[in-house]
């Protein structure tokens, strides 16, 4: 007979999509505005103005000149210009204090979110993202160093967009008053990627059934001294041993598409964390793109016939020279890669009682939801890296947590792909001949025994990388 159904509900989110702005620092804010109520409502702006134009007028930043006679300035189309990804093409491009610059900024009415993970869908054919093309406002800025000079040198195009974060969640949020969506404090928010959640069935059951021909059809097995088909799920070690035995004995792991029966398998470090000797000798440095330190502007001078110094007219007035060592940063790449692996593959799979909810973050009351499990974090020091010389180790809890629910499980990942990985997945399981039941199988409550019996080592539950 067949079992048909649909996987859906609050805990089902199969994968993490596109990872928008994944190169952005986890705490980098979007260019944004906010209001303060000190001395009346005042708008503050925090933004980058990457586009350098020829001039600024009441019409905005000049982006070119047309070929008419006489020639006329062409100003930015505010529905999509200036484009935020367009700026100076060289690291050494000279931008003077009087250069005319422009950029885009989010209005205070768009909720703040870190740049990491942010996504705003396009709303016009040019790629502009404003909710309302007529709602883009120009905000002009002049240097505050000269009180007598008010000519603008920067114009920011302020807009509201449909800001989403489909693949990330907030892990740090400063304390702000309720319903605050934009403020200076919220620039300090930090985002982290959502964990993938592969959902699949362990098996499609064909291989696990055998026929009981004793004539006791319809009779409870316990009454007829036969095998009882209502069995408990196996403990973790038995389950792992059985999977590895199947992998070693049969072809099931090779030809698994037919029965949706891919054998569970893992990266070795997910089960037993290994260190091989000490590999921590060489430091890693990074340097500025210009390969010099902080530069100052110098003019050329020459000796005046042995009597003091005078300006050298054969040398430019602005020579950029840095003194001393080049600034450099050191990072332990090896340790950070290992630390990141441990946190993502061990720390985030620790039991819930070893995790905590970040401050000021509101998670659902239902602990079985994807949003709750995904939002909980582990103290990094719990699985922090250290130089462990030539030894094998793992936290005790790893021996008590079912390792089959893990995003590095190739078998689960493949079976999840067969289901389609959609947000709502119809499934269809074909089972030979008769009804069956297994204790704790969510889809078939109750206990029944018919002529088809299960082997004692059944392996058929709905599994997910976030938990059964």
UniProtKB/Swiss-Prot annotation:
Listed GO CC annotations: host cell; host cell nucleus; T=25 icosahedral viral capsid
Single biological process term from Gene Ontology: symbiont entry into host cell
Induction trigger: Expressed in the late phase of the viral replicative cycle.
Coiled coil, from the record: none
Main location: virion
Subcellular location: Virion; Host nucleus
SUPFAM superfamilies for the chain: Group II dsDNA viruses VP (SSF49749)
Pfam assignment, any one: Adeno_hexon
Domain of life: Viruses
Keywords noted in UniProt: Capsid protein, Cytoplasmic inwards viral transport, Host nucleus, Host-virus interaction, Late protein, Microtubular inwards viral transport, T=25 icosahedral capsid protein, Virion, Virus entry into host cell
Subunit structure: Homotrimer. Interacts with the capsid vertex protein; this interaction binds the peripentonal hexons to the neighboring penton base. Interacts with the hexon-linking protein; this interaction tethers the hexons surrounding the penton to those situated in the central plate of the facet. Interacts with the hexon-interlacing protein; this interaction lashes the hexons together. Interacts with host dyneins DYNC1LI1 and DYNC1I2; this interaction might be involved in intracellular microtubule-dependent transport of incoming viral capsid.
Miscellaneous: All late proteins expressed from the major late promoter are produced by alternative splicing and alternative polyadenylation of the same gene giving rise to non-overlapping ORFs. A leader sequence is present in the N-terminus of all these mRNAs and is recognized by the viral shutoff protein to provide expression although conventional translation via ribosome scanning from the cap has been shut off in the host cell.
Family: Belongs to the adenoviridae hexon protein family.
Stated name of the protein: Hexon protein
Species in which this protein is naturally found: Human adenovirus A serotype 31
Highest classification ranks of the organism: Viruses, Varidnaviria, Bamfordvirae, Preplasmiviricota, Tectiliviricetes
